[in-house]
Design a protein with these regions (language model features):
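A conserved beta-strand element that flanks and buttresses the S-adenosyl-L-methionine
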Residues: 19
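Short catalytic micro-motifs in class I SAM-dependent methyltransferases
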Residues: 22-23
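Conserved class I S-adenosyl-L-methionine
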Residues: 46-71
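Conserved SAM-binding strand-loop segment of SAM-dependent methyltransferases
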Residues: 1-11
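Short Cys/His-rich metal-coordination motifs, predominantly Zn2+-binding knuckles/fingers
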Residues: 170, 185-190
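A C-terminal cap/extension of S-adenosyl-L-methionine-dependent methyltransferases
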Residues: 66-69, 93, 97, 103-179
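Acceptor-substrate binding/catalytic loop of class I
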Residues: 70-90
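A short glycine-rich, Lys/Arg-flanked "PGG" loop and its adjoining helix->strand segment in the class I
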Residues: 31-46
């Protein structure tokens, strides 16, 4: 599916699990993105979310020698055009406001230093990273953080045959393929093309 994560063409509660890795740092409006993820995730569903950490150790050291922006302020830091790092507290607050509860956290990319990669074998660094992800998670000092979150609500088994897509124009869920190259909204008549197997909602 090709679409915007601010307006996802999926029906409410269409997903059991959502995985968003190396994506959120491109979101200029994090609250809107998280609200949309919560909308398409069924109550009790799981969100696995990775985010760039503004408050990582290297950023703190750079700030200490006055070579970088403050990693302690809550607002997102745009380190390149449309590339953002987020303070852990900022993201936790907006996850809670969107209706998510964090169940597990992992510190990732602990050894993201060019010098270490030259001095130590990649397999060793990967193994050490895996061992330290949980113990170091409470410190939140790594460049990347993974979160496993639960969507609020009664985690009942979803009903079979629930709709998958939602029309972006009228928000109806009565869409079907009247032809192999499109999805047609029966409510408003909008045709959404399918090209090379990709549903295009743009």
């Amino acid at each position: 599916v090709a679409a915007s994560f601010y307006d996802i063409p999926l029906a409410d509660g269409a997903c059991d699990t959502i995985v968003m890795v190396r994506v959120l740092h491109h979101a200029a409006d994090v609250p809107a993105t998280l609200r949309e993820l919560r909308r398409i995730l069924r109550p009790g569903g799981t969100l696995v979310l990775e985010h760039a950490n503004k408050r990582h150790l290297k950023a703190m050291l750079r700030y200490a020698i006055r070579r970088g922006a403050s990693p302690f302020t809550p607002e997102p830091y745009e380190y390149a055009p449309l590339n953002y790092a987020f303070h852990p507290a900022y993201l936790r607050r907006h996850l809670a406001e969107a209706g998510f509860a964090i169940e597990e956290e992992r510190a990732v990319s602990i050894f993201r230093l060019a010098l270490l990669k030259r001095l130590a074998p990649a397999r060793l660094l990967v193994a050490l990273d895996g061992l330290l992800q949980r113990p170091l998670a409470p410190l939140r000092l790594t460049p990347s953080i993974f979160l496993r979150c639960r969507a609020a609500g009664d985690a009942r088994q979803p009903s079979p045959g629930r709709p998958l897509f939602r029309c972006l124009r009228c928000h109806a869920t009565a869409l079907d393929s009247d032809r192999p190259d499109r999805l047609l909204c029966r409510a408003c008549g909008t045709a959404w093309p399918i090209t090379d197997g990709i549903h295009r909602f743009r």
